[in-house]
A protein has these predicted regions:
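C-terminal alpha-helical interaction appendages
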Residues: 1-90
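Cystatin/cathelin-like cysteine-protease inhibitor module
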Residues: 60-215
Length: 215
């Protein structure tokens, strides 16, 4: 099981190797990435409050905290800006297989809303699997999804996204099976539930759909 303490160490090692950041500064930046004002604040957590990355699906680094630490720490070597630095850290966590989920780069709710758009839904939801029952009775091939609306709601416990769209297909004209429809109206409910401090989230996805009659 990978614990957050190992994650902090992994981030610190990456910063030291990639940017030649001194150890004490690397620990402060790692803590900021994970949502802490300081490394001491991170260490103050009891063991029961430290989360395993196995229980987290999505990371949203604390960009504001990281930006402030970069401004407040003296004698840092040349570094990427806080956004790129967060992206580089996230890429390394994935490369080292410390974390395998999405790392979303968003400083506030407005930016997060733009990230959790139809492109994110398309990358993280396979409609062929989610709507397999409707597809099975349609006698059609499906492969084109169009999102009509994407609505975003944020609260203390996390964020929710509700989307609607059409999964478009084509009836197999060479088949002697009847055409029961080649369009599925679908709805998606995605929730990112806050699990660890302000950066770790559990993702749940629910998809429903109804085959549109061709008649």
């Amino acid at each position: 099981m990978v614990i957050i303490l190992d994650t902090s160490k992994q981030i610190s090692e990456f910063l030291r190797q990639q940017y030649s950041v001194r150890a004490s500064h690397a620990r402060e930046l790692a803590a900021a990435f994970l949502g802490f004002k300081s490394h001491a604040a991170y260490l103050a957590l009891s063991a029961g409050q430290k989360w395993s990355l196995d229980s987290i699906d999505v990371l949203i680094p604390d960009l504001e905290c990281l930006e402030q630490r970069l401004l407040n720490i003296s004698n840092l070597p040349p570094l990427a800006n806080y956004r790129q630095l967060a992206q580089d850290i996230g890429d390394d966590l994935r490369l080292q297989k410390v974390f395998s989920g999405p790392v979303l780069i968003a400083k506030d709710l407005t930016e997060l809303e733009s990230v959790l758009d139809s492109s994110y839904l398309q990358e993280n939801i396979t409609l062929e699997d989610e709507l397999s029952g409707e597809i099975a009775i349609s006698n059609s091939w499906f492969g084109y999804e169009y999102y009509d609306t994407v609505k975003f709601e944020a609260g203390r416990s996390g964020v929710k996204v509700h989307a609607t769209g059409v999964f478009d297909g084509e009836h197999d004209g060479e088949s002697d099976r009847p055409n029961h429809g080649d369009k599925i109206d679908f709805e998606v409910d995605l929730e990112l539930k806050l699990m660890a401090w302000g950066v770790g989230f559990r993702q749940t996805i629910a998809v429903s759909g109804e085959l549109r009659s061709p008649y």
